[in-house]
């Protein structure tokens, strides 16, 4: 009995978290998406972070969040072991932000 209740609660929790993520993907609240991407990144959910950040890069261009977003996108790919895409993203980062906060780290991760 207790086992069935526990399984039901766990399934409901998993389904609700997937539902929240899907709502987030459809949302036009880019500030909320940015904060969610940072949270996913901090929790090690790099695939979800990369999906959100990939969408936000063009939208955040020219803002104070653009630099950090591009670096987090590169690190998300890197942490998923997608080294080729990570290197391309890091190269883009240090070309766009040659004196940026993360330029040295981006060059390191790009192998430059």
Regions found by a protein language model. Give the residues of each.
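Short solvent-exposed coil/turn linkers within tandem alpha-helical repeat scaffolds
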Residues: 24-26, 58-66, 94-103
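Bacterial signal peptide processing site
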Residues: 19-22
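C-terminal motif of bacterial Sec signal peptides marking the signal peptidase cleavage site
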Residues: 15-17
